[in-house]
């Protein structure tokens, strides 16, 4: 008989990639909509921004649990990812032309991918993952073909490293899972810090 699936945490994210990554390491979780506006503050660095948004998502999720007696009060994980090129923060493309421009700007360059992850209950803890990704030179035609697949449209920086854009990546230094949207090493550190024994289901 299969053991009962009981969540260790809530994941405050609508991202299927983050859910897939937690599944990979055996974390039992329930997910919720974070409902947080991702607006860069004036003079806010990308590092501070991703940690703040990750923490705001986790805090908002935990507050919603406190207000809902029907749901079990568990720690809430939040995460946020941004792509940074020449100190410019690249979020999700606003449309086709913006997405094509974004991908063209990444062609033949090295950019940073920052992912902040937070875990909140009556405690709060955060971690930051910083990765460097180098794209080969991209042809305009392949950028347009890639956009037409629909894959880039909801991704920070306009690409998914685990998808078709894998063929653009010449070099990666850092966390592959962090570039996907949830750095598993840092996420596991937070789970360990909160004494959540996710490995018991391995």
Curated annotation (Swiss-Prot):
InterPro entries xref list: ITPase-like_fam, Maf-like
Catalytic activity entry: dTTP + H2O = dTMP + diphosphate + H(+); UTP + H2O = UMP + diphosphate + H(+)
EC number(s) given by UniProt: 3.6.1.9
Cofactor names: a divalent metal cation
Site (Important for substrate specificity): 17, 81, 162
Residues of the active site: 80 (proton acceptor)
CDD domains: Maf (cd00555)
GO molecular function: dTTP diphosphatase activity; UTP diphosphatase activity
GO CC terms, sorted: cytoplasm
Alphabetical list of NCBIfam families matching this protein: maf
Function of the protein: Nucleoside triphosphate pyrophosphatase that hydrolyzes dTTP and UTP. May have a dual role in cell division arrest and in preventing the incorporation of modified nucleotides into cellular nucleic acids.
Name of the featured protein: dTTP/UTP pyrophosphatase
């Amino acid at each position: 008989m299969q053991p009962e699936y009981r969540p260790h945490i809530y994941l405050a994210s609508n991202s299927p990639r983050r859910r897939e990554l937690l599944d990979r390491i055996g974390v039992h979780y329930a997910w919720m909509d974070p409902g947080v506006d991702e607006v860069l503050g004036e003079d806010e660095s990308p590092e501070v921004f991703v940690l703040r948004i990750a923490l705001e998502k986790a805090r908002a999720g935990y507050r919603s649990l406190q207000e809902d007696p029907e749901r079990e009060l568990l720690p809430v994980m939040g995460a946020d990812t941004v792509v940074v090129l020449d100190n410019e923060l690249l979020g999700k493309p606003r449309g086709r032309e913006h997405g094509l421009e974004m991908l063209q700007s990444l062609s033949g360059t090295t950019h940073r991918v920052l992912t902040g992850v937070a875990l909140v209950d009556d405690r709060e803890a955060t971690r930051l993952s910083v990765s460097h990704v180098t794209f080969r030179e991209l042809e305009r035609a392949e950028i347009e073909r890639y956009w037409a697949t629909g894959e880039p449209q909801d991704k920070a920086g306009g690409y998914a490293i685990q998808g078709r854009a894998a063929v653009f990546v010449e070099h990666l230094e850092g966390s592959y899972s962090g570039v996907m949207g949830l750095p598993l090493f840092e996420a596991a550190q937070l789970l360990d810090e909160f004494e959540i024994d996710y490995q018991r289901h391995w």
